Swiss-Prot record:
Residues 1-62, 129-144 are extracellular. Belongs to the ninjurin family. Composed of 4 alpha helices: 2 hydrophobic transmembrane regions (alpha3 and alpha4) and 2 alpha helices (alpha1 and alpha2). Alpha1 and alpha2 feature one hydrophobic side and a hydrophilic side. In contrast to NINJ1, does not disrupt membrane integrity. NINJ2 filaments are curved toward the intracellular space due to cholesterol-binding, preventing circularization and ability to mediate plasma membrane rupture. It comes from Rattus norvegicus. This is Ninjurin-2.
Length: 144
């Protein structure tokens, strides 16, 4: 063995149409997947920050102010935790046996938190953080 650590090479042989075989490094794939998920997390984070701004601008007298403030804050907090988990997952080497159990647990935790975040965001959308049309005009603090 090359080192004191046991390493499993997680490579998959993939046949191309010409019959050639190439190796797919699953650790590289997992890292790219984590980076892509992090980018989506950033987009959702920005969206929720804008929703939070909208709720705060409407003020505490809006119908669902406390509910939306709580849901958006919980979603933002979960997204930060998910982002940290994804960075940790991307930094650990899947090829090292001693990391595989930990990576599996971290991946399960991240997946669970993403599911909870999606459910929270469904409720945020249902309660609505944006007023439109004549309702917004009537409740605006800057009359026309």
């Amino acid at each position: 063995m090359e080192s004191d650590r046991e390493i499993i090479h997680l490579q998959h042989r993939h046949s191309t149409p010409g019959g050639n075989q190439r190796h797919i490094n699953l650790n590289h794939y997992a890292t790219k997947k984590s980076v892509a998920e992090s980018m989506l997390d950033v987009a959702l984070f920005m969206s929720n920050a804008m929703r939070l701004k909208s709720v705060l601008e409407q003020g505490p007298f809006s119908q669902y102010y406390t509910t939306l403030l709580t849901l958006i804050s919980a979603s933002l907090l979960l997204q930060v935790v998910i982002g940290i988990l994804l960075v940790v997952i991307a930094r650990l080497n899947l090829n090292e046996v001693e990391n595989q159990w930990r990576l599996n647990q971290l991946n399960n935790a991240a997946t669970t938190l993403v599911f909870i975040t999606v459910v929270i965001n469904i409720f945020i959308t249902a309660f609505g953080a944006h007023k439109t049309g004549s309702v917004a005009a009537r409740t605006s603090s800057n009359p026309i």
